[in-house]
């Protein structure tokens, strides 16, 4: 909004000229989302506590230390969604189609998560909305997004770029739409599975969003994309502002979500944040890089898949003491804070590996 209002005055005002730069607006987005989180956080937490008498239901079969979390409110992802969307609407170019498509997906996945959290709180159990129902809704939203990208782009690309290899890409044809849907839905659920400890998912999400802030900027810049031999996609640079807002809002949320958490992001936050990262990776044609940068999410999801299939195949045996993987280490006696910080370190390593793929070709 501010960008569009100030754009006509770029040549007449130094301040207006600053808004012409994506980097300036991205930095401002971090400041705004951080500030909004600090201001609205205590108010939202108090409000959620007044509505949720028992807070988020805690699994009885989980680590014993988790019973101290009883009564902690959920749906804190509302804080992240509101601050991120507001900063994007204020600072991004509102004529940019990618901004609106991404915000649509972000909010839509957030609504699915809210429905799930609401069901858990009202029923006072950790099951929420049926898994198949959630997958169906996620599939519908991701399909709408993929169709919009297909028909709004003048020359849609069905190429899957392979990182670390020069000029290596796979033409998936119209199967690319199915693949893109898988990326978006998979990313949403992967982040959801990772969000099981205080602050565990928040920082890796911030690292991933920060990585894609850089990727969006480079892919949307003709000079940089040519230099790095990346697929140039006009107008994706504006997604840098949105990604920066995600970084700020996640760091602001961490203030209240660090152990011992005052609030959980819930599925409202995890499904929406995972979904929006998947959408941005599809738009920027860096789907595989998302799997690298967000490697922690992939590992957590893989641990669940292996556990479930092995349990069924062996009729009751388990690979891990408990899945997702972070609970396995808790069952081994690791303190929650140690699991969280070590997983943060792993996510930093994955982010650096993913970003190195932009240059190593």
UniProtKB/Swiss-Prot annotation:
GO terms for molecular function: metal ion binding; phospho-N-acetylmuramoyl-pentapeptide-transferase activity; UDP-N-acetylmuramoyl-L-alanyl-D-glutamyl-meso-2,6-diaminopimelyl-D-alanyl-D-alanine:undecaprenyl-phosphate transferase activity. Disulfide bonds: none annotated. The chain crosses the membrane at residues 28-48, 74-94, 99-119, 133-153, 168-188, 203-223, 236-256, 263-283, 288-308, 338-358. Its main location: membrane. It is an enzyme of class 2 (transferase). Its cofactor is Mg(2+). It comes from the Bacteria. Catalyzes the initial step of the lipid cycle reactions in the biosynthesis of the cell wall peptidoglycan: transfers peptidoglycan precursor phospho-MurNAc-pentapeptide from UDP-MurNAc-pentapeptide onto the lipid carrier undecaprenyl phosphate, yielding undecaprenyl-pyrophosphoryl-MurNAc-pentapeptide, known as lipid I. This is Phospho-N-acetylmuramoyl-pentapeptide-transferase.
């Amino acid at each position: 909004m501010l960008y569009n209002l100030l754009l006509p005055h770029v040549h007449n005002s130094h301040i207006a000229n600053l808004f012409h730069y994506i980097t300036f607006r991205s930095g401002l987005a971090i400041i705004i989302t951080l500030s909004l989180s600090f201001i609205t956080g205590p108010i939202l937490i108090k409000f959620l506590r007044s509505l949720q008498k028992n807070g988020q239901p805690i699994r009885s079969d989980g680590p014993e230390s988790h019973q101290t979390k009883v009564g902690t409110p959920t749906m804190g992802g509302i804080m992240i969604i509101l601050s991120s969307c507001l900063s994007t609407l204020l600072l991004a170019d509102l004529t940019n189609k990618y901004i609106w498509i991404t915000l649509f997906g972000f909010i839509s996945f957030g609504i699915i998560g809210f429905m799930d959290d609401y069901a858990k709180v009202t029923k006072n159990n950790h099951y929420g909305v049926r898994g198949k129902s959630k997958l169906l809704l996620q599939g519908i939203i991701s399909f709408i997004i993929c169709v919009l990208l297909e028909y709004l782009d003048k020359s849609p690309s069905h190429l899957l770029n392979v990182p670390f290899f020069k000029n290596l890409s796979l033409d998936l044809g119209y199967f690319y739409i199915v693949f893109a849907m898988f990326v978006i839905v998979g990313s949403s659920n992967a982040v959801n599975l990772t969000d099981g400890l205080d602050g565990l998912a928040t920082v890796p999400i911030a690292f991933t969003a920060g990585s894609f802030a850089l990727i969006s900027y480079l892919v949307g810049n003709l000079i940089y994309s040519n230099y790095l031999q990346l697929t140039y996609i006009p107008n994706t640079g504006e997604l840098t502002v949105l990604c920066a807002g995600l970084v700020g809002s996640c760091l602001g949320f961490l203030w209240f979500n660090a152990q011992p958490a005052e609030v959980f992001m819930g599925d409202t936050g995890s499904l929406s944040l995972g979904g929006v990262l998947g959408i941005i990776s599809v738009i920027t044609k860096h789907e595989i890089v998302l799997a690298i940068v967000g490697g922690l999410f992939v590992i957590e999801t893989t641990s669940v898949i292996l556990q479930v299939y092995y349990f069924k195949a062996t009729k009751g045996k388990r690979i891990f003491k408990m899945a997702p993987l972070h609970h396995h280490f808790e069952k081994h006696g690791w303190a929650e804070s140690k699991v969280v910080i070590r997983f943060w370190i792993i996510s930093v390593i994955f982010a650096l590996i993913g970003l190195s793929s932009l240059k190593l070709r």
